[in-house]
Amino acid sequence: MSMTADSQSDYAFLESIRRHLLGESEPILSESTASSVTQSCVTGQSIKPVYGRNPSFSKLYPCFTESWGDLPLKENDSEDMLVYGILNDAFHGGWEPSSSSSDEDRSSFPSVKIETPESFAAVDSVPVKKEKTSPVSAAVTAAKGKHYRGVRQRPWGKFAAEIRDPAKNGARVWLGTFETAEDAALAYDRAAFRMRGSRALLNFPLRVNSGEPDPVRIKSKRSSFSSSNENGAPKKRRTVAAGGGMDKGLTVKCEVVEVARGDRLLVL
């Protein structure tokens, strides 16, 4: 009974393949046919196929014969022969797309013409003037792009270093004005290291104790003038002559008179 059921399922599978290839619709069973099929399935009776089996076709397909048995194809039926030809081509040569379909696909896309660089017209190059930047302006722009902790830039381009002293309730302590932002940042690092030790957040941690000299501060003109006076000669005070308050038009004549009085000589 199991062999009969297998052959029926194989036949139904091949029939569905044939109908799919030929574009036919699935047959609609009537009520009487459906009831007979249901009764035969319940009672275990086998349903006879419509077409007879031809063993000559199954000899060409050993793999089909091993799994499905003989194929239910008729030699006199044109539809069965069409199915046989399709299966034969698929078994021996494999499925290959037709050349006509590939040609149609190629013709559906527009042709693209690729031009070589030689076909392009030569374009005259326009000379571009390169603006020369001075090293001072380049250094200023580079310094503006980077910000250091505890450093503020003055409006005139110099850099001031400041730090908040925790001993003075976070008041700002001015550390000086420097030429570059790096010098101001280094001055801040050294002041922060002296106040907070290893807990301080530094700009250059490796340069704090490297033995570098202290950055040079920018001194104001007033302080530099006072320091030069302290180190040099004393200040010159303006002295007014005895007759400074007189009118310019008044002239004073002085005469020297020698008077001899005994042994002494008096000059008046």
UniProtKB/Swiss-Prot annotation:
Q: What biological-process GO terms show up in the record?
A: cell division; defense response; ethylene-activated signaling pathway; phloem or xylem histogenesis; response to nematode
Name where it mostly resides: nucleus
Taken from the record, one Pfam family name reads AP2
Domain-related comment: The AP2/ERF domain binds specifically to the 5'-GCCGCC-3' motif. The affinity of this binding is higher if the seventh amino-acid of this domain is basic.
PROSITE patterns, per database record: AP2_ERF
For region Disordered, the annotated ranges are 215-244
Q: Which PANTHER family match?
A: DNA-BINDING DOMAIN, ETHYLENE-RESPONSIVE TRANSCRIPTION FACTOR 1A
GO cellular component annotations of the record: nucleus
Protein name per its UniProtKB record: Ethylene-responsive transcription factor 1A
Q: What species is this protein from?
A: Arabidopsis thaliana (Mouse-ear cress)
